[in-house]
Amino acid sequence: MSAILKATNINKIYDEGAVSTQVLTGLDLTVTAGERIAIVGTSGSGKSTLLHLLGGLDTPTSGEVWLHGQLLNSMNETERGAMRNKHLGFIYQFHHLLAEFTAIENVAMPLLMRPEVSTAEARQQAIDILNSVGLEHRLAHRPGELSGGERQRVAIARALVTKPSLILADEPTGNLDYDNAQSVFGLLSELQSTMQTALLMVTHDRNLAALADRQLLLRNGHWENY
């Protein structure tokens, strides 16, 4: 199966004055279509940094990140943004929804960045995906009017509305209680399977990681045996 995402020899060093800190060292990773991968590690292990690099939100100090056969490192920010919008969906521990916009407006936003998609089309697609996550009765509600579990369902809908080939999820259930976490991850897994979208998930929860096809352990910036 062909690779959606391929990272080779990824290194990330942060310089603060005379002090250099190596956060990631020599990491390789390949993600194929429809695959579900969990990256496990404690706080400070470099998980979120790696996810940002893989999503083109930051660039590695050295190494290469390829998305659908195109080298993200060689692109400017506008080009990387277009690649993200076309191929990737993002879900965070904290939903990152815009407080002044309704659920429909938040979910439609990635589609409205595409000049070929009309406002009416974006709105209808947002309604359809919100219905699929069980929020047909909360379409006009703003984030402050939704529960934690509902906000994360809106975030999932926003990540999936563009029909991405890969979802990058950073602790997607980390801010929820156990019951909501199980419900939200079950929904995400179901939609991911139905849409044949790959999922790369960062988590410290080994029980959640066990539900993935493959588990990777990141410790002090290195891969270790899981």
Swiss-Prot record:
GO CC term, one of those recorded? plasma membrane
Q: Enzyme class, one word?
A: translocase
Q: Where does ATP bind?
A: G41, T42, S43, G44, S45, G46, K47, S48
Q: Which Pfam families match?
A: ABC_tran
Q: Which part of the chain is the ABC transporter domain?
A: 5-226
Q: Which SMART domains match?
A: AAA
EC number(s)? Answer: 7.6.2.-
Its record classes its membrane topology as:
Peripheral membrane protein
What molecular function terms (GO) are annotated for this protein?
Answer: ATP binding; ATP hydrolysis activity; transmembrane transporter activity
The record, for InterPro entries, names: AAA+_ATPase (IPR003593), ABC_transporter-like_ATP-bd (IPR003439), ABC_transporter-like_CS (IPR017871), ABC_transpr_LolD-like (IPR015854), LolD_lipo_ATP-bd (IPR011924), MacB-like_ATP-bd (IPR017911), P-loop_NTPase (IPR027417)
User: Which residue windows are coiled coil?
Assistant: none
What's the protein called, per UniProt?
Answer: Lipoprotein-releasing system ATP-binding protein LolD
- Tell me what organism the protein belongs to: Psychrobacter cryohalolentis (strain ATCC BAA-1226 / DSM 17306 / VKM B-2378 / K5)
Q: What gene is behind this protein?
A: lolD
